[in-house]
Amino acid sequence: MLVNDIENNAGMRVRQIADSAIVASGKPLFVPDFAGHFSARLGLAVRIDRLGKHIDARFAHRYFQQVTVCCVVSGSDWADADVNPETDARALSFDGSLLMGNFQPYDGKSDLSLTLSIDGEPKQDWRWNNAAGKLQQAISNVSRYFTLKMGDLLICDSEGEQAELHIGGKLTAAINGNESLTIRLR
């Protein structure tokens, strides 16, 4: 499940992503041919550890223990004129549209710093102050509408600057300086 605009609860957008969209760190991303250009932007992934519905924000810290950096891939210049890149699942949930790093424990106290580089060149830096509070609020907001189950992934999207992807490139992303995601683009 991808959550956009979590810092503005009134404008929060939620969309579900297919399991086949996930590419694990170390695996290659085969850049699709159905759009002219593809780009990636940083996100933070949280793995849900227990079943819950209508979770109050003050209890949401009990529902996750691990986080990782991820990248949300999107395309532009669609070959199919009827594809709306903002709402169509073909544009948002295609195979390979979510690049996932390796999960690491999160103490719930520290701020998070996420970085994205392509071919060693820094492309995006996202500093998240009060990360625990924002994650807890996102879990609370989403659980009002969806039952969260063990193993579900909640992706908080940076909606920041996008980095252009190109075949032959290497994408790396780190969380708090620890490289967590490495993907070769083919």
PLM-predicted stretches and their roles:
Residues 12-13, 74-186:
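Catalytic-pocket segment enriched in acidic/His residues
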